[in-house]
Amino acid sequence: MLNHYFLGDVDFIQSVYEYVNSNMYVLLSGEEAVIIDPHKSQELTDLLVEKNVRKVIILLTHEHHDHTSGIYWYQEHFATTIICQKNGAEYMDSKKYLRPMILTFILGEEDKINGTHKLEEFKKVFVLRQYSVDVTYEEELSLKWSNHMLELTHIPGHSKGSSLIIIDDSFVFTGDSLL
């Protein structure tokens, strides 16, 4: 399910990935969209096609699979640019990335506790692949998008590539990092 909000001239969309309760955020303006921490969503893809979106910028708060699992999906449907902190990008392009042990462990433990089958369902839809990131940064990156300033700041802790994404000095996306 997509939740819509409006931030001035930008359509702001939030979606929770049903398998792992991970948030994806989308900023939509004209024929461009910014997706933060993507997961596969046919509903979002249909909306982006309906809005004639041609280009998608993918920003990652960090490199863990619950925040990157939809990259391939949007690459298949749109012209994409992936932006990630350098350490996260290096990990996503390594063979180690092909072993999502922590995520599968957590889902398995939740299944035991809750009597659910989320891990089994997740494995049916999860596509495991390495990614080459288009734009990396060491400590900070600023970019202008649709009259808005996007700032990415490296804050290692949760992962080596963890970053804050700040929009117009007003909105902060932390991924799994705590402030």
Predicted regions and their residues:
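Active-site HxH/HxHxD metal-binding segment of metal-dependent hydrolases
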Residues: K40-S41, T45-K144
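Catalytic core of the metallo-beta-lactamase
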Residues: M1-K55, E76, K123-L179
